[in-house]
Amino acid sequence: VYWAHNHGSKNFKIVKDYIDLAVDMKWPYSLIDAEWNEMSNGGDIEDLITYSLSRNIKPMIWYNSSTAWMGPGPLYRLNSKENRIKEYTWLQKSGVVGVKIDFFPDDYSSNMDYYIDLLEDAAKYKLMVNFHGATIPRGWQRTYPHLMTMEAVYGAEWYNNKPILTDRAAEHNVTLPFTRNVIGSMDYTPGTFSDSQHPHITTCGHELALSVVFESALQHMPDRPEVYSSLPRKVREFLSGLPTAWDDTKLLCGYPGADIVLARRKGDVWYIGGLNGTNENKTLSFSLVPLQVEGKTMDVFKDGVDDKSFAIEEDIQLSNDKMDMSCLPRGGFVAVIK
């Protein structure tokens, strides 16, 4: 909600639209973002949770860690053991399945201990956890597999904060797979096909490819419901069925900041994402030999005639030969091989 509506979670009807979007897109979860404790215009948080569950959408809820910036609430719900158990008990009883906890100021030992306390208690109440505005991944998922993802990245929310990401996003996005995302799940919130407070100049093909290139066990889609609803049918179907946990990953080509083609496998299906990080037209060339897909077919979603459109090709018969994909400046593509 935050990416499109700064204070949207104060508005019951706005958040309800995102739950309806999750139903339409067959996404199993929906996040109720910051300031839900001030919700009005048709209902409160209890009403929204009830509505979400009635539509078979599992709700997750945002919290301020209350350790640094005391801005959006709710505040001080999780800091003490007593308050945390009270809140987690309410969440579990209400049917909430996870928490997104935000605004951690530093890596001092007191905050590192706080992360572990949050995870330990969340496990007891069967709550998934997303740490936002947080430290980098540190392997905690090995001990706490309910830690689904962490931000620790200059992600898409910055289109709503400052203009700095607009000019740098393409190169930045092609650097992250070689750096930040190597060490753990990354809650970048990809897939911004329209504009927030500050515009993006990456293409729609680029934005779609981020959902494959960036790994996150919870992949948050940040754009407005009406934007996703207006996407071409085949693109919506792709986003509806996109996995978030993978069986294999292979780098097919790339160089940090310049370009990347990354393949991820779920079962027998390969998903390939390609990104152009430059301001020039570029052809991305790569071999399919590592994927062993000869005789299979491929659907491609790539840059159209301009940065706001897609070109979609279906049922391309494959060999193991080299592939060439043309990208617009700051462009990209997705391929699905079955």
Regions found by a protein language model. Give the residues of each.
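C-terminal beta-strand-rich structural cap/linker in extracellular carbohydrate-active enzymes
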Residues: 315-338
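Conserved, mostly hydrophobic/aromatic
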Residues: 22, 102, 129, 213, ...
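Carbohydrate-binding surface patches
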Residues: 255-292, 333-336
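Conserved structural scaffold segments of CAZyme catalytic domains across common CAZy folds
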Residues: 1-60, 331-332
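Catalytic cores of secreted or luminal carbohydrate-active enzymes
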Residues: 205-251
